[in-house]
Amino acid sequence: MSGARPEQAALSRNTDMSKTEETRAVIEAMVDGLNDHRILDIGEFFTEGFRWMGNTGCGTKEGLRQFQDNWQKPFQAAFSDKVCVDEARLYMGEWAAAFGRQDAIHSGTFMGVEPTGKKIQIRYMDFWKVKNGKIVDNWVMVDFPKVLAQLGVDVFSGHGWESYDRKEEMAPKPRKN
């Protein structure tokens, strides 16, 4: 890399490490709340103005109400019998991260796909910032292309890089600088 290197990890640099156990308690209780399919009282774990920042397809939700109306409700309408399974969690001061899956039944319309009744897995990663016992920020990556593939929709039209793994296409090589 030429030139100055960008600043790294600026958001978590000055985290208060004495808050690790408090953060753990908030996240564990919140995941239990999600598994109980709570919507109306989920504010127990989030500030009114918290930010939920998702990848394309998920969108960004500004505040608790948008999260409830534009994420939780449509998600629970599309997927029933949903169980969140964090496969790993990390805690560091006011920060927490997890990756895992939600096992669910596709029982409502999702991204234009009518209900199939299929049992699917929804993979995700979450990064949370907790202050004063509540989540203020949540960065989220949900693997919607994988969800849609399980429902018979290939968003990459056969050109996902898995085609290189299957030797169906040749992976391009970088140009030399």
What does each model-identified segment do?
Residues L40-E94, R101-D103:
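A solvent-exposed, acidic/Ser-Thr-rich amphipathic alpha-helical stretch
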Residues S2-E48, F156-N177:
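Short, low-complexity N-terminal intrinsically disordered segments enriched in polar/charged residues
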Residues V85-R89, R123-W128:
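Hydrophobic/aromatic beta-strand elements that line small-molecule binding cavities or substrate pockets
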